[in-house]
Structure formats: C-alpha cells, structure tokens
C-alpha cells in the first residue's frame, strides 16, 4: 500500500516515510513526489498532521495516540509545512510519541509524510 485515504478528512496520505531530512529538503521532496500516478503531494500543515491523532484515547501522561485505523502508526516526529511565526528559521513538527507539537530549527532532520487533497 503506497497511500491511504483518511475516511474522516478525505486527505490521502503517503504510507511510507522516505526518512529524515531538513525542512527545505522535505518541501522539495514533496514537490517532486509522484505516487499512484498523482503528483500533487505536499508537506502537510501541523493541523493536518494532528488529524491523525485520536484524542479520545490517552496514554502515558494523558497524551493522545495515533488513530487505530491509520495503517502507518508509529511514534516518530514529522515535519509540517507550518513555519513558526516568531522565528522563521523554525517550523512546527508533530511528535507522535506523546502527540507533542513543537517548533524546531529547519536545519534539523525529521521524518516526512506527504499528503494530498
């Protein structure tokens, strides 16, 4: 399975992360991605990454976990396309190990999961 369409949001997600890369490299990767004959992939904003969380299920320290129906459940940290407004050298990441949404320097390397729709 290369992609998965979220029945809750209608968004289509890339199932396999290509690995870790910087934020700028992640943007370029998304622009060049072609899966299932589709080439309109993009790096998701933080709010779209957060839709993968199930806020009704809590675990350690009362943090939500990834939704059960998501086929690529993991605990990795993913870049969003959202720049951190007070510091344009940083962007938001979503850490699925604890559902943290934090800003980090764009020169750091994190995982990428592209979306379309």
Residue ranges: model-predicted function:
Residues 77, 103-117:
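Short, structured beta-strand segments at or near domain termini in extracellular proteins/domains
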Residues 1-41, 111-115:
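Extracellular adhesion/carbohydrate-recognition regions
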Residues 2-5, 71, 106:
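Generic detector of ordered secondary-structure context
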């Amino acid at each position: 399975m290369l992609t998965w369409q979220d029945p809750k949001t209608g968004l289509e997600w890339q199932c396999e992360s290509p690995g870790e890369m910087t934020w700028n490299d992640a943007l370029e990767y998304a622009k060049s991605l072609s899966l299932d004959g589709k080439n309109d992939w993009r790096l998701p904003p933080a709010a779209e990454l957060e839709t993968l969380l199930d806020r009704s299920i809590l675990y350690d320290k009362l943090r939500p976990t990834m939704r059960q129906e998501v086929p690529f459940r993991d605990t990795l940290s993913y870049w969003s396309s959202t720049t951190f407004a007070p510091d344009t050298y940083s962007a938001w990441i979503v850490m699925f190990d604890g559902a943290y949404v934090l800003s980090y320097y764009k020169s750091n390397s994190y995982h990428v999961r592209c979306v379309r729709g």
